[in-house]
C-alpha cells in the first residue's frame, strides 16, 4: 500500500500538467473544441478519479 500512493500522486501531477497545457490550447483554437471535447471530458474524469483514489489511499492506515 505504501508504494501505490506515490504512484497516484505522480500520475495526478502528470495529468494535471497535461490538462493545464491542453485545455487552454483546445479552447483557444477555432473549431478544436468540437473535435476534442471527448478528450477533455475523459481527462477531467481521469483527473477526478485520481484525486478520489489518492484521497482514499491516503486515508487508509498502512
Swiss-Prot record:
The family this protein is said to belong to: Belongs to the PsbZ family.
Keywords carried by this UniProt record: Chloroplast, Membrane, Photosynthesis, Photosystem II, Plastid, Reaction center, Thylakoid, Transmembrane, Transmembrane helix
UniProt xrefs under InterPro entries: PSII_PsbZ, PSII_PsbZ_sf
Name the UniProt record assigns to this protein: Photosystem II reaction center protein Z
Function according to Swiss-Prot or TrEMBL: May control the interaction of photosystem II (PSII) cores with the light-harvesting antenna, regulates electron flow through the 2 photosystem reaction centers. PSII is a light-driven water plastoquinone oxidoreductase, using light energy to abstract electrons from H(2)O, generating a proton gradient subsequently used for ATP formation.
Matching Gene3D superfamilies: Photosystem II PsbZ, reaction centre
Matching PANTHER family: PHOTOSYSTEM II REACTION CENTER PROTEIN Z
HAMAP family named in the record: PSII_PsbZ (MF_00644)
Amino acid at each position: 500500500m505504501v508504494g501505490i500512493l506515490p504512484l497516484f500522486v505522480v500520475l495526478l501531477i502528470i495529468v494535471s500538467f497535461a490538462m493545464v497545457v491542453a485545455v487552454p490550447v483546445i479552447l483557444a483554437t477555432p473549431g478544436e473544441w468540437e473535435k476534442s471535447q471527448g478528450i477533455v471530458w475523459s481527462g477531467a474524469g481521469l483527473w477526478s478519479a485520481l484525486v478520489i483514489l489518492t484521497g482514499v489511499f491516503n486515508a487508509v492506515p498502512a
